[in-house]
Amino acid sequence: MAHSIWHEKIKSFLPEHYYGRINHFLDEAYASGLVYPPRENVFKALQVTPLEETKVLILGQDPYHGPKQAQGLSFSVPEEISAPPSLINILKELADDIGPRDHHDLSTWASQGVLLLNACLTVPAGQANGHAGLIWEPFTDAVIKVLNEKDSPVVFILWGAYARKKKAFITNPKHHIIESSHPSPLSSYRGFFGSKPFSRTNAILEKEGMTGVDWLK
């Protein structure tokens, strides 16, 4: 992970030498088989959205496990890749909430202060949750704890039971939580559709005197 403010803040919430354990895990994982995303993109979310600019967190579970899908940003895929089912539903809700967006690559959200973080940062090809419980959760929980310490408000968007459990780390009353069921086809009709997370996020940011996100960009 590139040295940054993120690096130092996250480190303070982890056991000693945990970064070394992560690097060892990555060396072994990428040497032993096909793993997504490409190794250079494992920490992309933290590289493209600096801590000081982060005002929204959208928490995913783990990267897409199909060829060329995962790019290090939760729910996002490269522009030339077909949208997976969860992203299709996210874009459908966005269209109903604010307006249509044709792009599958969510990098422009990340560049506006939306941290697109997965709880697990790697996945073996074809094995959803294949790296769950091995190394990543203490690290990404630490990211949430770092955000919780921010003096400026952050909107935490938590979709699904797994993400909603992370509310335990969000104790600072300055922050806001938007939660619903997950956008996956299995649960999207149980509260995700119609939840209007994008307009609600912007309403919160603007009420706090901050610039809203151009979700259609």
Swiss-Prot record:
What Gene3D superfamilies does this protein's entry cite?
Uracil-DNA glycosylase-like domain (3.40.470.10)
GO MF: uracil DNA N-glycosylase activity
For this UniProt record, the keywords arranged alphabetically read as follows: Cytoplasm, DNA damage, DNA repair, Hydrolase
The UniProt entry lists the main location of this chain as cytoplasm
Q: Which Pfam families match?
A: UDG (PF03167)
A single Gene Ontology CC annotation of this entry is: cytoplasm
Q: Any one Gene Ontology biological process term?
A: base-excision repair, AP site formation via deaminated base removal
| Reactions the enzyme catalyzes | Hydrolyzes single-stranded DNA or mismatched double-stranded DNA and polynucleotides, releasing free uracil
Q: Which SUPFAM superfamilies match?
A: Uracil-DNA glycosylase-like (SSF52141)
The UniProt entry, under CDD domains, shows: UDG-F1-like (cd10027)
Cystine bridges: none
Q: Which InterPro entries match?
A: UDG_fam1, Ura-DNA_Glyclase_AS, Uracil-DNA_glycosylase-like, Uracil-DNA_glycosylase-like_sf
Q: EC number(s) of the enzyme?
A: 3.2.2.27
Q: Where are the active-site residues found?
A: D62
Query: Which compartment or compartments is the protein found in?
Result: Cytoplasm
What the protein does comes down to: Excises uracil residues from the DNA which can arise as a result of misincorporation of dUMP residues by DNA polymerase or due to deamination of cytosine.
PANTHER family, alphabetized: URACIL-DNA GLYCOSYLASE (PTHR11264:SF0)
Please state which protein family the record places this protein in.
Answer: Belongs to the uracil-DNA glycosylase (UDG) superfamily. UNG family.
Name under which the protein is recorded: Uracil-DNA glycosylase
Q: Which organism is it from?
A: Streptococcus pyogenes serotype M49 (strain NZ131)
